[in-house]
């Protein structure tokens, strides 16, 4: 197959767009902030098809299962994996902040902090209890779930729909074939929309730099650097070890999904790359049923980057305000973070709301301390989203391997750049 000119490769276009966005935001901030609709529009185009794609993928995957017990088995293994790896992420964030101490030296008096800027986040977090979260999974109507784009609600509907089709067998084949055909159409739409990724990345990055400015990063560079370094260590060491045990290289896997990562980098939303990630994982040898169950669930239950961020941000605020936390308080923080992190999603800003929910149950630390990181949260959200998407990709491969539904030949071909897996134009490799 003839190799594309480098300027036609999607990830090259996205890199160029991000660089141009940074330059425009730095030198022409007023004009750059007007570029926000470009980023918002791209994310809306992607979110437009996320719900239907999840529904169709899960339904066809479950409908094709001969053993319905497999649905519960796959879900159980995925949740077990999520909890174990999420705990590692929380502990790593805690340990890194203790070792590098990014908040030491600020010496801020909590009484001087104005909490008005974070009041809206605190209000949203206050209403998020575990019971509310579980009840929220049940939609008011099927139509409402799709209209609001609620991933877990759509997943619940798809599980029920697919289970009934599997029970019907041949009698439901017409519906299954229709949904399978619809899946192909939806991924075709994604391929078209993905071509607009450079425009979306340019708009989102230009707005971010134009609104907040590079200068806003300087006082808190140590925290940003600590977070990025910790996330890299998590991907290379924790996820890298898991990948090696499973039989693949984390470096090659990251390279394989580089286009999706660059889209996430430009938009700060891991949801922006969800459809492409699901397709890439199928092409890498993961079964459709496992992809359909693990990836959407992971977007609420397996947010490794958000977990690192939460424990690190809480300890940073404590260090900056000279508040000492006992080990018992830190263990309580871990336990609470395990619950509150499940309410976060792949959308920009959700991590900050989750942080507010976590701080609310640690009364020693003032909620107003969140203003210290409000200005840089937007710059940290990119790293959160990047870590989240890599974590969900690795989780899907691992669960597929556990289920013995991983085509290792396809995986090897995908990660080494050989074979048929790169024939799809959207793959860009």
Curated annotation (Swiss-Prot):
InterPro entries: C4_dicarb_transport, Na-dicarboxylate_symporter, Na-dicarboxylate_symporter_CS, Na:dicarbo_symporter_sf
Ranges that cross the membrane: 9-29, 45-65, 79-99, 149-169, 185-205, 223-243, 308-328, 356-376
Superkingdom per UniProt: Bacteria
Membrane topology: Multi-pass membrane protein
Main localization of the protein described in the UniProt heading: membrane
Subcellular localization: Cell inner membrane
GO CC annotation terms, alphabetical: plasma membrane
PROSITE patterns per record: NA_DICARBOXYL_SYMP_1, NA_DICARBOXYL_SYMP_2
Keywords on record: Cell inner membrane, Cell membrane, Membrane, Symport, Transmembrane, Transmembrane helix, Transport
Pfam families in the cross-refs: SDF
A molecular function GO annotation: malate:proton symporter activity
Biological process (GO), any one: L-aspartate transmembrane transport
Similarity annotation: Belongs to the dicarboxylate/amino acid:cation symporter (DAACS) (TC 2.A.23) family.
NCBIfam families in alphabetical order: PRK01663.1 (NF002461), PRK13027.1 (NF009587)
HAMAP family, A to Z: C4_dicarb_transport
Entry function: Responsible for the transport of dicarboxylates such as succinate, fumarate, and malate from the periplasm across the membrane.
Name used for this protein in its record: C4-dicarboxylate transport protein
Species this protein is from: Burkholderia ambifaria (strain ATCC BAA-244 / DSM 16087 / CCUG 44356 / LMG 19182 / AMMD) (Burkholderia cepacia (strain AMMD))
Organism lineage string: Bacteria, Pseudomonadati, Pseudomonadota, Betaproteobacteria, Burkholderiales
